[in-house]
Regions:
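Glycine-rich phosphate-binding active-site loops on the catalytic face of alpha/beta enzymes
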Residues: 148-168, 206-213
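Short, intrinsically disordered, charge-balanced linker/junction segments flanking boundaries
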Residues: 20, 228-231
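Conserved N-terminal beta1-alpha1 strand-loop-helix module at the mouth
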Residues: 19-134, 141-144, 175-203, 212-221
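Low-complexity, intrinsically disordered or signal/transmembrane-proximal segments
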Residues: 1-3, 9
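C-terminal helical cap(s) of enzyme catalytic domains, especially alpha/beta-barrels
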Residues: 223-227
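Short hydrophobic alpha-helical segments of the AMP-binding
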Residues: 149, 176, 228
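Solvent-exposed, charged amphipathic helical/linker segments at domain boundaries
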Residues: 164-180
Length: 231
């Protein structure tokens, strides 16, 4: 019994050490995969597909961006790992209506709860308040999350190149298109761009924040701007 406890203690220490050496992005993805599996066990796909919004029409963010003077995608974010609470005591409706009245092309809604304080309810409230494209900003690792996005009123999903393989990006983006959703791919460097670019993507965005360290530099956008194709 003493040997068993010692072995269990050693394994626990190894797990703790591994967690301590992980960057924030790796921790988020581990938590996200667990979260998705839990949700799958609680809410079946059939329930998502039965949503009133599941078969509703979607708005094209890519078309609006091409014909816009501002080219702005605004964001609804409650907090983040780098800045803690940003604005936690506001009305989702007021924020998104303000964005729409300001002439933005679309709104990105954070739905991650643990690290960003968001929820799918925020997306639902936004959908009920505006008639411009909504992007579900989430760490998507599974088709189930794309079904959720459709059921809660998203028009666009975000795929993050840093956490997905090329095969996964292709699979997830094609699945999103099958549901009538557009796809915005987020890249951070040239390697991610060259690896992930493919016909099933509608838009590509450059994140100036390194998701592994959360450091920010505008040099990333400057470097990649000329390398992203127009079509």
């Amino acid at each position: 019994q003493a040997q068993t406890r010692t072995k269990e203690h050693s394994e626990s220490e190894r797990c703790d050490t591994k967690l301590k050496t992980m960057n924030i992005l790796e921790k988020i993805i581990i938590d996200k995969k667990r979260e998705v599996e839990l949700k799958k066990s609680i809410i079946p796909v059939s329930q998502l597909e039965a949503s009133v919004l599941f078969n509703s029409r979607t708005y094209s963010m890519s078309k609006l961006l091409k014909n816009s003077f501002s080219g702005i995608i605004a964001e609804h974010k409650r907090r983040s790992p780098s800045k803690a609470i940003i604005n936690n005591n506001h009305s989702v409706e007021d924020v998104v209506l303000g964005y729409q009245n300001a002439g933005v092309c679309g709104i990105s809604v954070l739905t991650d709860a643990k690290y960003f304080g968001g929820s799918l309810d925020d997306l639902l409230l936004a959908k009920a308040s505006v008639n411009i494209p909504l992007l579900r900003k989430e760490f998507i690792v599974d088709e189930y999350q794309i079904l959720e996005a459709k059921a809660y009123g998203a028009d666009v999903i975000l795929l993050i190149a840093a956490v997905l393989t090329r095969k996964e990006i292709k699979q997830l983006s094609e699945f999103a298109h099958s549901l009538g959703l557009e796809v915005l791919l987020e890249v951070h460097n040239l390697e991610e761009l060259e690896t992930a670019i493919m016909p099933s993507l509608d838009m590509i965005g450059v994140n100036n924040r390194n998701l592994k360290s959360f450091e920010v530099s505008l040099d990333y956008s400057k470097e990649l701007a000329s390398k992203i194709p127009d079509e």
